[in-house]
Amino acid sequence: MDVDWASWLRRWEAQQAYYLPDREERFHVMIGLLREVVGSTPSVLDLGSGPGSLARRVVDSLPGARVFAIDADPLLLELGRQAVGDRGGSIRWVEADLRQDSWVELARTWGPVDAALSTTALHWLSPREQAGFFARLAGLIRPGGVFVNGDHLSFDQDQQRIGAAARALQEEEAGRDAAAHPAETWDEWWQAVESEPGLAALAAERRSRWGGHPDYHSPGEALAMQASLRQAGFTEVGTIWQHYENRVVVAIR
């Protein structure tokens, strides 16, 4: 049965923007940083790529870039393959679980890695899994290369009132934007996917594999992530952009 892949991708983008009104600004910062640190023709890993929201923007902004897009979700990967494509060989779609070692060997087939990017994905790894993940990642990125992560990262344990105020302001801002630009929620988008006959097999495979994503958001995760990156061997680590708890963390290898 035919699937309107382009329409599903547009709906995905709309529901993501529903939760992240400043999503495009965050993408802009990440891609600009990529260009400034490793140039305009980088070899990039997109870790937890989903349907390629970031990968597509990277190759559109930096036509000489090559992106190795890795995700464990079979439905979102197929959405990327069908709706985004390989952009003339610039994007390669790979199914692999970042919690396991197999993705590292697959990434090595892409050749030397200048940079790795991730958006709104690594909170699905526990702190222990993150530490192992960063150690493996440090072994892939060339010296002078960069890792850039965009995600919601909580304030520290001794900043609880600051964190609560930031979350309240962020929810208020997101509510205003959602009222001005109505869109499906995350749950509504997935419910619609489940009712699409042409996506039934992929949705069933996804359910059998995941059942539900774990969420390891916790107080202090921003500082904990930076400490794990330093321990893994990254030489410079810091936050380059922040809007409430929405941050871009950068680590130079």
Listing of model-derived features with the role each one plays in the protein:
Residues T235-R253:
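Core SAM-dependent methyltransferase catalytic element
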Residues M1-V38, S53-R57, S102, V148-D177:
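Conserved class I S-adenosyl-L-methionine
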Residues G48-G52:
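Class I SAM-dependent methyltransferase "Motif I" SAM/SAH-binding loop
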Residues L117:
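A conserved beta-strand element that flanks and buttresses the S-adenosyl-L-methionine
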Residues L45, A55-S102:
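Class I SAM-dependent methyltransferase SAM/SAH-binding core
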Residues A131-P143:
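A short glycine-rich, Lys/Arg-flanked "PGG" loop and its adjoining helix->strand segment in the class I
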Residues H217-A232:
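Short alpha-helix
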